[in-house]
Amino acid sequence: MYADIIVDITHEKLDKVFQYRIPSHLEGMLKVGMEVVVPFGMGNKEIKGYVTGFSERAEYAPEKMKEVLKIAEESVAIESKLVALAAWMKESYGGTMIQALKTVLPIKKKEKAKEKQKVRLLLPEAEGKEKLELYLHKNQKARARLLAALLDQPEQDYDFLIHKLNLTRSVVRALEEQKVLALESEQVYRNPVIYQQKEQKEIIYTEEQQAAIRTFSKDYEQGIRKTYLLYGVTGSGKTEVYMEMIDKVLSEGRQAIVLIPEIALTYQTVMRFYTRFGGRVSILNSRMSQGERYDQMERVKKGEVDIMIGPRSALFTPFERLGLIVIDEEHEPTYKSEQVPRFHARETAIERARMEGASVVLGSATPSLEAFYACECGRYQMLRLRNRTGKQALPEVYVADMREELKHGNRSILSDRLKVLMQDRLEKKEQIMLFLNRRGYAGFVSFRACGYVVKCPHCDVSLSVHRGGKMVCHYCGYETQTVKNCPVCGSPYIGGFRAGTQQIEDLVKREFPQARVLRMDMDTTKNKGGHEKILAKFADEEADIMIGTQMIVKGHDFPNVTLVGVLAADMSLYSDDYRSGERTFQLLTQAAGRAGRGRRPGEVIIQTYSPDHYSIRMAARQDYEGFYEKEMNYRDLMGYPPASQLMAVLMTGSDENKLTTAAEYLKKYAIRVSADGEVQVIGPASPSVGKVNDVYRKVIYLKSEEYQVLVRIKNHMERYIEINRGFANMRIQFDFNPMNIF
């Protein structure tokens, strides 16, 4: 018997199956997905690899074939279904098989189990009381305290007893030696959330919610598995619909995965699921320790979990009876991986569901154009929620033209109308959210006399100013002190866009000194639990104003928020990215949706220098379909997804001349292997950031109406790169329908 092994070396030339003989002592023990140790290369170096299959017949002389040495210690096996999914990901998105296998492995190695010690009384009650009298008679007070506590409660936590009774460990050992008590260990799970299942209040669903639940349940009962788009306005009760769908799936003996963007994966959100489903729920997120993540996967394997909630990585939870995958806020760009393989959770979830006979539900108030287009084409079924629950009205939205504010002498980033409304809300003890679509204290630094922009010496990007007199590169982390004079002309006059969250906070505190202000951005939430602490403070009304970047608009529900101000609404509108209009519309609509979710009506002020742009006009009207029609006309005209398919080929190397030459050769090859008129090849060009960490970058774009045509060309290009030395010392990655233009 022979094992097919993918070795753990990320190199295109080694991206193939290697056959090894299975020794007699491992026969019957190896399974697909197991990590093993094998001899590799001329020197028979011991390396790890994964079993991807078995065969009865040797592909070459059996006497020359090497043997599998052993099963890797502390390894975690990949479920065989996920090995098949990894193969699909490699084929669909590029990269090597070992990269795909490591992607579908939620945890990389075993962690030591956490144990809890208990103390148990061994003596019958009468004998124990006699022993207690003896200890008291001998004035052995510590032993007497311990025995008295155990007579009161025969089994207790070891650490609790030590601290509560002020005992030394030698006292416990002495009674253990006398056979008075026994010390026992039991495994305890490192659970990231302490939950308490509560009695459910009866939920009265709207007719629209009931219709969505009925459609899904009827299909599920009939064995129909498909992809649904739950398109509902902000506050329409999508989460309640998800939970009813999950309940239906659980009643059929199946399991569910709920994907939520990391930025929206808050305690408040998770507790809604714990309250409904109790201990059958688990969670994954990047803030958990390796031990916590390992314990949750162990619970999954033991069948103790039926619902896994988490970001993109939770998609690979090894459930045996997967019945449903929910992707909340499906439009979020974080569902697309920026690491090889550059997979999208939406397409990968649909493929996993197809393999395992499950359904997929995508939810959003602002669906991605891809999802809405798929509904129009009949690939997904749309379920609509047009109204908020509780008959709450959508907030009134006003657009403030900042050009007019300048004409009237207002140079503040806060419009006059926003200031008036903020004062009004503060007097009424209502809460306010101010959203700024950027990070940091200020943007780029330029000198007005000559226009020089201060850039990172290692990357082709401008430095951002942070409080404390530092300029920081957000690509490589380079830091330097803020310059006072221009290094080119010596001018001291500094310009640039100076509106970061820190400066907004300073401005608000000056304008409204009586207000309690919270700031939520990457800097204030970098510590574990920082995100939850800020949200909890705001939810408990310990602050009047929350200022933040896009993380404050992601699905949070604060009933006392009646005013939302969107500052610099068009900051994301003029980036060199074909999705900029869509992203702007989504952010503005999601931000507006935070207002008026309680009993009091909400108002939204959108501040912009581009009030006539359709993304801003449609967001102010909460008109998704109007926006979709305009944006699809643009995508059709330009040949951008979803109207056609796009593949980016990103090439990096330390020698700029060699990289430029190699990119030209690769472009010519792509044209040669594509049929006439089937593919449009654009580039090669330098991306907007042409150099990062002293490594140069080039990009080639390929457009086609058919996704599989691009996959076929990608396969041709991979083989061409593998056999040509001109691509040595270069890194080449493929990205299908990229979320970010390079």
Where are these regions (language model features)?
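A carboxyl-terminal module marker
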Residues: K668, R672-V692, Y696, I732-F736
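Solvent-exposed, membrane-proximal periplasmic/extracellular interface segments of envelope transport
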Residues: E59-A72, P687, V692-E705
